[in-house]
From Swiss-Prot:
InterPro entries the record matches: EF-4 (IPR006297), EFG_III/V (IPR035647), EFG_V-like (IPR000640), EFTu-like_2 (IPR004161), G_TR_CS (IPR031157), LepA_C_sf (IPR038363), LepA_CTD (IPR013842), LepA_IV (IPR035654)
GO molecular function: GTP binding; GTPase activity; ribosome binding; translation elongation factor activity
Keywords: Cell inner membrane, Cell membrane, GTP-binding, Hydrolase, Membrane, Nucleotide-binding, Protein biosynthesis
Domain of life: Bacteria
Name of protein: Elongation factor 4
Pfam families: EFG_C, GTP_EFTU, GTP_EFTU_D2, LepA_C
Occurrences of domain tr-type G (ranges): 2-185
Length: 599
């Protein structure tokens, strides 16, 4: 165990984390030249295309230090950098003793750098700052060193200058890992205690768990027990990734590896759970386990009603690999049958949609995303959790109060754009908690904001207001009471449930106006008149009329009597009236997206 080092790399999106991981693996000769490719640890196509890491990976590398003349076993645990997956980051850090904090030499410290840094500090990890991309023309390592000192309180002289792309400073990083990060503590003879920090589904092995062994050892044939559910399985394979899956005879205390135990469902092996042996169980679980709670909900509907079963199969198969997604069937009078799905955040939702269409060839209509509201009814003592605005009664007199989820948003921006950012945050009902300067050019703002205001276009607005320089991260705070009303959209007096949503009272009129105008543009004209109305309860607060397409029925009258023309026009009017009574308006997907734009 003296020669084992467990570490992870934490960084803001796009600071070069996956490239650095590739260089470390290459330097230690863990792969041949033939197997080289960019982003080796990003296994999904979508991760490569977007250049983001979604799934965690854990790689075992053997490193021979020429300076110390010693052999080391390094376990690199790669973490996703995106805010939606922050729970996964905290679990992977719990499996390590140290972390490389990667900072882009031209961008400097950004919001997720700070968020992930504090997560590492909470786990008492040894942090090695690495200033990456020093080969860029815009690199300014001295400014970054000052930021490291002032913002993070670390010794700037300990920062390593590197360029993962050019391979500069790689050996220095490896030496720092072996010298500064302590070896893992643990007792091989104690009862087994192992932390699951990731899992995925393999068609041949079943669900595979990536684990860090804290105490004891694990080999094929052992009967394991999971702490949170009490379920038991027999281990069929243990091993490590060297980036390829390699079988090993045993995993001992301090090791990081994978186990397979013919587990049928990924939901049985939850990230953060503790594994122990049935015959000799450990007394206490590793602290910090919680089930990932979906924060954002949206309806997924197949474009063709006949594809409903295919969508169900696709969601079932997909959720085997992604334990964070939840789904339940729901029916909408406007769109038909579909599913109400819960996601960790907006990026997670986009990824699920993209992977459904890519891996299962299914096109879906997505309704506007919403959050989980809590409401207290006057005639009931309990508090209801509501995932869709359709579950909220139209009669607001029955409701005592509504609570919505709030988050603490951290924004780091160049000082020139502070005014723009403050305006956006105030428009989104933000309450300023903190405002400080990190250095002469960079400001940090903290706002308490409703999650509903963030999930639609907040990220895009902040990026465009700061020419792409501002970065943003958020964490869940809790629920607060809000003055919300339900905005119902009616088309020819028929409420369309998929277009209704909750909105703050002060913004109701503005949003209703924007939405009916948007719908007027997107709904195609029919042969009869269409009325689009927005209502709060029984009060109509905005309406638009889409005129009918009409044939010129008086074209055949040459001159002649006015009463003849009037008769033809009256007849046409009667026909249109009848059509309006029985005609159905079909809504295009753009109509649902216009709800987003109005929000």
């Amino acid at each position: 165990m003296e020669n084992i080092r467990n570490f992870s790399i934490i960084a803001h999106v796009d600071h070069g984390k996956s490239t650095l991981a590739d260089r470390l693996i290459e330097f230690c000769g863990a792969i041949t030249d033939r197997e080289k490719k960019d982003q080796m640890l990003d296994t999904l196509d979508i991760e490569r295309e977007r250049g983001i890491t979604i799934k965690l990976q854990a790689v075992k590398i053997n490193y021979h230090s020429k300076i110390q003349n010693k052999d080391f076993t390094l376990h690199l645990i790669d973490t996703p950098g995106h805010v939606d997956f922050s729970y996964e980051v905290s679990r992977s850090l719990a499996a390590c003793e140290g972390a490389l904090l990667l900072i882009d030499a031209s961008q400097g410290i950004e919001a997720q750098t700070v968020a992930n840094f504090w997560k590492a500090v909470e786990q008492n990890l040894v942090i090695i700052p690495v200033i990456n991309k020093i080969d860029l023309p815009a690199a300014d390592p001295d400014r970054i060193k000052l930021q490291i000192r002032d913002i993070l309180g670390l010794d700037p002289d300990e920062a390593i200058l590197a360029s993962a792309k050019e391979g500069i400073g790689i050996e220095e990083i490896l030496e720092a890992i072996t010298k500064r990060i302590p070896p893992p503590k643990g007792d091989e003879n104690a009862p087994l205690k192992a932390l699951i920090f990731d899992s995925y589904y393999d068609p041949y092995r079943g669900a595979v768990a990536f684990v860090r062994i804290f105490d004891g050892s694990l080999k094929v044939g052992d009967r394991i027990k999971l702490f949170s559910t009490g379920k038991e399985f027999e281990v069929t394979e243990v091993g490590a990734q060297t980036p390829k899956m390699t079988k090993l005879p045993i995993l001992k205390a301090g090791d990081v590896g994978y186990i397979a135990a013919s587990i049928k469902d990924v939901r049985d092996i939850r990230v953060g759970d503790t594994i122990t042996l049935k015959s000799n169980p450990t007394k206490e679980a590793i602290p910090g386990f919680k089930t990932a709670k979906p924060m954002v909900f949206a309806g997924l509907y197949p474009t063709e009603d006949s594809d409903f079963e295919e969508l169900r199969d696709a969601l079932e198969k997909y959720s085997i690999n992604d334990a964070a997604i939840t789904y339940e069937p729901e029916t909408s009078p406007a769109i038909g049958m579909g599913f109400r799905c819960g996601f960790l955040g907006l990026l997670h939702m986009e990824i699920v949609q993209e992977r459904l269409s890519r891996e299962y060839n299914i096109d879906v209509i997505t309704t506007a995303p919403s959050v989980v509201y809590r409401l207290k009814l006057k005639n009931r003592s309990d508090i209801l959790e509501v995932k869709s605005s359709n579950d909220i009664p139209d009669n607001f007199g029955l409701i005592e109060y509504i609570e919505e989820p709030y988050v603490l948003a951290t924004i780091i921006t160049p000082k020139d754009y502070v005014g723009n950012i403050i305006n956006i945050c105030q428009d989104k009902r933000g309450i300023q908690v903190k405002f400080s300067y990190l250095d002469q050019n960079t400001a940090l703002l903290e706002y308490e904001m409703p999650l509903q205001e963030i999930i639609v276009d907040f990220h895009d607005k902040i990026k465009s207001a700061s020419k792409g320089y501002a970065s943003f991260d958020y964490e869940f705070l809790g629920y607060k009471e809000s003055d919300l009303v339900k905005l119902t959209i009616m088309i020819n007096k028929e409420p369309v449930d998929a277009l209704s949503f909750l909105v703050h009272k002060d913004k109701a009129y503005r949003k209703a106006r924007a939405l009916v105008e948007q719908l007027k543009e997107t709904i195609p004209r029919q042969l009869f008149e269409i009325n689009v109305q927005a209502a709060i309860g029984s009060k109509i607060i905005a309406s638009e009329r889409i005129p009918p397409m009409r044939a010129n029925v008086t074209a055949k009258c040459y001159g002649g009597d006015i009463s003849r023309k009037r008769k033809l026009l009256e007849k046409q009017k009667e026909g249109k009236k009848r059509m309006k009574q029985f005609g159905k308006v079909s809504l295009p997907q753009e109509a649902f997206l216009s709800v987003l734009k109005a929000q």
